[in-house]
């Protein structure tokens, strides 16, 4: 893999994280009902503290590599499964959407780790490993929510 491939994956991950912030925040305000309280809280916390921090870390790394993160007109929104449900009490569809997104993010960060290893870029590799751990923890949390809703 080349440095160009690392930069491409960093840009993709940055766009995904920004889109996730928007979708997590939106869902945290759209969901209603007592059973959704914990899900709403987790979405808000993750959007504000983790996903936005990931985007900032990715943007910083892109800058260090003399590249720039994509702006809003440069990336395509793809998180169809994270769109707010028609029924605001349908927390299960949001939970499933989060699990699906986290699995996609995990694959992106694994690809970034491989690309960084092949490009001999240990700084990007370390960053991707760190973020991968966060994404795996969040997926586990939402799988737990899923079991509670079954």
Role assignments for model-derived ranges:
Residues 1-150:
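Iron-associated oxidoreductase/ferritin-like identity signal
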């Amino acid at each position: 893999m080349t440095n160009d491939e690392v930069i491409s994956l960093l840009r993709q991950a940055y766009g995904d994280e920004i889109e996730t912030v928007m979708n997590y925040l939106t869902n945290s305000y759209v969901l209603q009902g007592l059973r959704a309280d914990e899900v709403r809280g987790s979405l808000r916390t993750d959007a504000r503290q983790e996903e936005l921090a990931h985007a900032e870390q990715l943007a910083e790394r892109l800058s260090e590599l003399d590249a720039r993160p994509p702006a809003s007109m440069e990336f395509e929104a793809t998180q169809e499964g994270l769109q707010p449900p028609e029924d605001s009490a349908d927390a299960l569809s949001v939970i499933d959407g989060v699990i699906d997104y986290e699995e996609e993010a995990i694959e992106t960060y694994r690809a970034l780790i491989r690309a960084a290893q092949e490009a001999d870029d240990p700084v990007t590799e370390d960053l991707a490993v760190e973020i991968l751990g966060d994404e795996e923890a969040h997926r586990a949390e939402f799988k737990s929510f899923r079991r509670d809703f079954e």
